[in-house]
C-alpha cells in the first residue's frame, strides 16, 4: 500500500514540475518576442526620407510642367510610367552636325536628393562620340562637380545637344575617338554619321 501511495504522490509532482517548466519556458520566451519588435525607429528614418521625396517630387513635377509647355529645341522628356523619378528623353541629332537625322534615347534618373544632387543621365542609343562611352555615360561637367540646384533638366538637355554639336576632345571618355577627332577629322565624321545611320535611325 505504501508503495502505491508513493506512486500516486509522485505522479502529480512530476506533472506539476513539467507544468512549471512549461510556464518558465513561456516566460523566458516573452523577451525574445519583444526583441523582435524594435523596428519602430524606422518610422523616424522613413519620415525623413518621405520629406526628401516630397521636396524632390515637387521640384521634378514643376520641371515636368515646364518642359512639357516649353521643351528645349529638338528635345523631349517625361516619366517612363508612374515613377516620377525615372524619365525617358529623346534628342534629335542637331541640324548640321554629324548626328543630324538621328533619334537618340536617354534615361534620366533623379535621386531623392534632387536638386541638390545631379540627375543621372545616360544614352540608351549607341553614339560615336568622344565624350559618351559604350555604356552611355556622358562626360559633362554639370552632371558632376559643376552641378548646381539652380540647373534644370531642360538646361542639362541643352548642354547635351551642345556637346553633340561641339565635342570636347580635351576631356574625353573614349580616348581613341578623341585622338581621331583631332588627327583625322574626316574619318571621325564619317564614322559618326555611319553609327548615326546604323543605330539612331
UniProtKB/Swiss-Prot annotation:
For this chain, the family text in UniProt reads: Belongs to the ubiquitin-conjugating enzyme family.
Where does the UBC core domain lie? Answer: 55-201
- Give the function comment from the record: Accepts ubiquitin from the E1 complex and catalyzes its covalent attachment to other proteins. In vitro catalyzes 'Lys-11'- and 'Lys-48'-, as well as 'Lys-63'-linked polyubiquitination. Catalyzes the ISGylation of influenza A virus NS1 protein.
Some GO term, biological process aspect, for this entry: which one? protein K48-linked ubiquitination
The name this protein carries in UniProt is Ubiquitin-conjugating enzyme E2 E2
For whether the record's keyword set contains Nucleus, the answer is no
Positions with biased composition (Low complexity): 46-55
Say which domain of life the source belongs to.
Answer: Eukaryota
Q: Name one GO molecular function term.
A: ATP binding
Q: Where is this region: Disordered?
A: 1-55
Q: Which residues carry this modification: Phosphoserine?
A: 11, 15, 18-19
UniProt key word Disulfide bond: no
Q: What is its EC number?
A: 2.3.2.23
Biased segments, Basic and acidic residues type: 1-10, 21-45
> What is the catalytic activity of this protein?
S-ubiquitinyl-[E1 ubiquitin-activating enzyme]-L-cysteine + [E2 ubiquitin-conjugating enzyme]-L-cysteine = [E1 ubiquitin-activating enzyme]-L-cysteine + S-ubiquitinyl-[E2 ubiquitin-conjugating enzyme]-L-cysteine
Pathway given in the UniProt record: Protein modification; protein ubiquitination
The alphabetized UniProt keywords are: Acetylation, ATP-binding, Nucleotide-binding, Phosphoprotein, Transferase, Ubl conjugation, Ubl conjugation pathway
Q: Where is the active site?
A: 139 (glycyl thioester intermediate)
Q: Which organism is it from?
A: Mus musculus (Mouse)
N-acetylserine PTM sites in chain numbering: 2
Task: Enumerate the Pfam families for this protein.
Answer: UQ_con
> How does the record describe the protein's post-translational processing?
Autoubiquitinated.
